[in-house]
Amino acid sequence: MSEDLSMKCGLEIHVQVDTNSKLFCQCPTNYKDVEPNTNICPVCIGHPGAKPMPPNKKAIDVAIMVAKMLDCEMVIDKDIYFQRKHYNYPDLPSGYQKTSVPIGEHGTFLGVGITEVHLEEDPGQYKPDLGTVDYNRSGTPLIEIVTDPDMKSPEEAREFLRQLMRLFRYIGHLRGEGTMRADTNISIKYNGIQGNRVEVKNVNSIRGVYKVLKYELIRQKNVLRRGGEIKMETRAFMESQMITKGMRSKETADDYRYIPDPDLQPIVLNNNWVEKVEAQMPETPMNKEKRFVEQYGIKEDDAKVLVSDLELADVFEKVVAELGNDKNGISLAVTWIRNELKRVLVYNKIEFFETNLKPEHMVELINSIKDKTISQKIGKTIIEQMVEHKGEKTPKELITEMGLTVIEDTSELEKACEEAIKNSEKAVEDYKSGNQRALNSVVGQVMKLTRGRAEPGTVVKILKKKIDG
């Protein structure tokens, strides 16, 4: 019997704003490299009578930018007030979280509806297994993005988050996936039976969200298949086991007892404020991809790979400009940045910014290949060495240090070709019998004997001359 199974997923994504001070006080937002409970003040830890400062201006500006990038309608000339969201948990010393009403609404991103974008404060860090609470994080500005339940599969949700994190890297001023937490809402319909919505709280990675959805899809299907009922509940993600576990029944807005915070004046956005923020907005990844295809005439797949890393995309454009911005320069830049440099980055599991390489390094390398100072094979070795040395040595320095310049002495090349012919009797016979590809084996022998320092085109000419007579 065939199964009729479908799912709906919505996400509540929280990401930290990269500010120097917290949302409602002057305490530093650095909480990872300091002793617990040192970057705190009476506001951070909810002392009675401690009054919050007006919200951090940079945090508001970044929230506006995020809302605009997600194509939201901005809330203009209306009070945007902060509310107290009440719940009892050790990481929330005041017993409530300050959270704004929407700054932007009714947006869309990759075909997924964006319900709203708003600001709120991050709670502290509670470790139940140790019984400790660190309030250094408490009060750090958070932007929350709430989506409509438009995602229909774990794969779609994963891709949505990947693209959203890429957008965040382009925006800047956000701390990205390392600080991202997502509340994952999922409901399924199985053979005509609609299940209730389940929320899985505080999933802290894209991979985690994907695993949660895969697990919940199977778990909820099995419950309905056995004739059970899906409870409307909140569950926790047990990352070590890759399962979810029931925590409590699902809260509603009434359970949080929202009230306006009497200690904070409302924010009122106007068109002038929003336009000033818009003027500082970067090009979106999607627009950059489209421009790369149109402006440089490269393939969509190549544009997608380059644009996936903002710094890599910037280097590509600078290298193309240095190489003359012509078809040949663009082709070389694609080969050595999109293909070879990206290969080395993926192998080493690092981003471009971690290499300390500069556009000049890539230009120098490509020019060394163009003028045949080194072979393409040696070029691949040099790019690996540049990454390994974190950009401390230029291509020319590495070429000299490793003795990797192309062999220009014809007699030396002829000697290597003669030895390769002697060691490749079968390949030579096959070539003489009409198998042109067999010559590649002999060329490979020459490259091995010369440690890649021979220019392949020159080697082929010498080999043909010697074999064909």
Curated annotation (Swiss-Prot):
Pfam families: GatB_N (PF02934), GatB_Yqey (PF02637). The keyword Nucleotide-binding applies. GO terms for molecular function: asparaginyl-tRNA synthase (glutamine-hydrolyzing) activity; ATP binding; glutaminyl-tRNA synthase (glutamine-hydrolyzing) activity. GO terms for biological process: glutaminyl-tRNAGln biosynthesis via transamidation; translation. Heterotrimer of A, B and C subunits. It comes from Methanococcus maripaludis (strain DSM 14266 / JCM 13030 / NBRC 101832 / S2 / LL). InterPro entries: Asn/Gln-tRNA_amidoTrfase_suB/E, Asn/Gln-tRNA_Trfase_suB/E_cat, Asn/Gln_amidotransferase, Asn/Gln_tRNA_amidoTrase-B-like, GatB, GatB_C_1, GatB_Yqey_C_2, Gln-tRNA_amidoTrfase_suB_CS. PROSITE patterns: GATB. Allows the formation of correctly charged Asn-tRNA(Asn) or Gln-tRNA(Gln) through the transamidation of misacylated Asp-tRNA(Asn) or Glu-tRNA(Gln) in organisms which lack either or both of asparaginyl-tRNA or glutaminyl-tRNA synthetases. The reaction takes place in the presence of glutamine and ATP through an activated phospho-Asp-tRNA(Asn) or phospho-Glu-tRNA(Gln). Gene3D superfamilies: 1.10.10.410, GatB domain, N-terminal subdomain (1.10.150.380). It comes from the Archaea. This is Aspartyl/glutamyl-tRNA(Asn/Gln) amidotransferase subunit B. The gene is gatB. Belongs to the GatB/GatE family. GatB subfamily. Its EC number is 6.3.5.-. It catalyses: L-glutamyl-tRNA(Gln) + L-glutamine + ATP + H2O = L-glutaminyl-tRNA(Gln) + L-glutamate + ADP + phosphate + H(+); L-aspartyl-tRNA(Asn) + L-glutamine + ATP + H2O = L-asparaginyl-tRNA(Asn) + L-glutamate + ADP + phosphate + 2 H(+).
